[in-house]
Amino acid sequence: MRILVTNDDGIHAPGLATLEEIARELSDDVWVVAPESDQSGVSHSLSLNDPLRLRQVSETRFAVKGTPSDCVILGVRHILGEHGPDLILSGVNRGQNVAEDVTYSGTIAAAMEGTILGIRSIALSQAYGAGGRSNLKWDCAREHGPQVVRKILETGIEPGILINVNFPDCEPAEVQGVAVAAQGFRNQALLSIDARVDGRGNPYFWLAFAKARFEPGHGSDLKAIAEKRISVTPLRLDLTDEPTLTRFAQAFSA
């Protein structure tokens, strides 16, 4: 099985190294095509107004001056060519990708691009807690990742579907199993704008989520992570809401 590994945190990210270890537990044919720099939050964007620059790091590792989606396209269509990947793994992201995160995430978008190209694709992310990004428990993803990916592949991924996996902020032995969960929703009132002024008196801003108690919905990816369970969420490319489609069709045909 040929595996293409990518991410949105960049070619030097520790999560990418973790995912390479996971991939090599599954196959000895692993290729890496990742962004040259951090592309967190770029979602499914493509570089249409700038050329893509490709740098070969080693025989099977490449860095791209572009987005995660650019990396998948270059990896599949140019680097691997006629011998394309059987599986695309994206991550392991530095921080969870749950709830509304999936609409912003370059990690998720890379898996989406793989799905568009007809390749089984899985996005993986490692949550972190009060300790912040500097204290991520990569061992959680590293130890549980291979068996979770194997089970997903054994179960099967239908066309047009990608799988979003999130590992909780805990040691591997503390994981309370796997939860197949729905995409959750956060309290967007917690999103804050931090206004500041630079040394020249010019204003600038940071976006951040304020820390507050929040009860995630039952059966959601947020709830699973809070309960120290690995969340597995199927996502689909078709964003059509069928009930609303039917309701609007009836309304406009009246």
For the regions a language model picked out, list residue spans one by one.
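A cross-family phosphate/adenosyl-ligand binding-site feature
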Residues: 3, 17-78, 82-84
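Short glycine-rich anion-binding loops that position phosphate/pyrophosphate groups of nucleotides
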Residues: 9, 38, 67-68, 93-96, ...
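Short beta-strand segments
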Residues: 33-35, 65, 90-93, 123-125, ...
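Electrostatically charged, flexible surface regions
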Residues: 71, 136-254
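Alpha-helix C-terminal capping segments
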Residues: 75-82, 109-120
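Short, Asp-centered acidic motifs that coordinate Mg2+ and/or phosphate
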Residues: 87
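Glycine/threonine-rich flexible loop motifs
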Residues: 96-105
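Glycine-rich phosphate/pyrophosphate-binding loops
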Residues: 115-137
